[in-house]
């Protein structure tokens, strides 16, 4: 790989910064520590920004860098969103990226995310040749696959507790930002549903890219979506005493909220996106499924954030967010 700064890059002028959403202070034999702080990196246009900031929540074992660049070195969705006039806040969920983790305060982590799992999720065997937007190698040792897997870490063993932490940190970020739009990917979708549930009125809309599902799914090696779209408890009106009572009840923070689910044509996640939309609509949301092939955008899998047409896959998301901004 040549030095990136010597390649033909793009000259940009933006404002940027970083801060933390601190974790709870806990006592350990060694002293006082923080439990689960969340790192936040933000960028905004040099001169002003659209009214509502965007909060970008990465998926599964990924990190905030999922939004900032692609495995082949191009700008990711976050810089394209800034170019479109938005202020973006990119988080590293607890235990991922720059948000530190220790089992003494969070609990045990699962196995390190292996190449084989990454291949199955993002670049599976493609005998029919439909997954054209990942033209790179699919074998362990191929450069772009190395770049993608480098960002992936383990998930906490206790999926529900990790989602509670994510929801709390995102809710507190919303306290800082005020009304915002959430943009989530994959397993990060659960954190988005929960954060909106904890701060009704603070989320103007949710763009969920390839959200995990279907409702009440068992996720092998990860956990169970016991409460419909989340492993952690979600508040309903009237109150659901058990997960089985959730379907059809109003979910504060989602009720009345515009939500768009974006799916790629070659992704298995597209197969259950309509079921997620139905679940959300039954909770009072205004949900729609945006299947990219219906817009003429074809060949994308689960990682449509960083596939070769990422500059095109982000455009329907930008267009939808603009409708929320102007509502």
Feature annotation, model-predicted:
Residues 47-50, 54-132:
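Short, surface-exposed "cap/lid" segments of acyl-processing enzymes
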Residues 218-283, 288-290:
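The feature captures the conserved acid-bearing segment of alpha/beta-hydrolase catalytic domains
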Residues 297-327:
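Catalytic active-site module of serine/aspartate enzymes centered on a nucleophile-bearing elbow/loop
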């Amino acid at each position: 790989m040549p030095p990136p700064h010597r390649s033909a890059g793009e000259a940009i002028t933006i404002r940027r910064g970083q801060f933390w959403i601190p974790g709870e202070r806990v006592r350990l034999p060694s002293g006082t520590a923080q439990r689960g702080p969340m790192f936040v990196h933000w960028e905004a246009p040099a001169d002003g920004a659209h009214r509502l900031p965007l909060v970008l929540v990465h998926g599964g074992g990924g990190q905030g860098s999922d939004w900032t660049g692609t495995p082949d070195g191009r700008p990711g969705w976050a810089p394209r969103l800034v170019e479109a006039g938005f202020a973006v806040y990119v988080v590293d969920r607890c235990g991922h990226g720059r948000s530190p983790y220790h089992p003494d305060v969070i609990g045990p982590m699962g196995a390190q995310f292996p190449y084989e799992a990454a291949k199955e999720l993002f670049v599976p065997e493609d005998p029919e040749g439909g997954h054209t937007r990942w033209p790179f190698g699919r074998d362990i040792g191929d450069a772009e696959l190395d770049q993608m897997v480098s960002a992936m870490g383990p998930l906490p063993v206790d999926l529900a507790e990790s989602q509670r932490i994510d929801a709390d940190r995102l809710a507190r970020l919303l306290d800082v930002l005020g009304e915002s739009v959430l943009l989530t990917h994959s397993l990060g979708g659960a954190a988005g549903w929960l954060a909106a549930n904890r701060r009704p009125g603070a989320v103007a809309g949710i763009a969920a890219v390839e959200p995990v599902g279907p409702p009440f799914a068992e996720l092998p090696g990860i956990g169970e979506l016991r409460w419909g779209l989340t492993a952690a408890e979600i508040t309903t009106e009237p109150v659901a005493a058990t997960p089985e009572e959730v379907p059809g009840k109003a979910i504060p923070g989602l009720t009345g909220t515009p939500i768009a689910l974006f799916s790629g044509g070659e992704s298995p996640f597209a197969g259950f996106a309509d079921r997620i939309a139905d679940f959300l609509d039954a909770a009072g949301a205004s949900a729609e499924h945006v299947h990219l092939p219906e817009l003429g955008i074809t060949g994308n899998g689960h990682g449509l954030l960083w596939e070769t047409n990422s500059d095109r896959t982000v455009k329907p998301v930008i267009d939808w967010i603009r409708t929320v901004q102007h509502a």
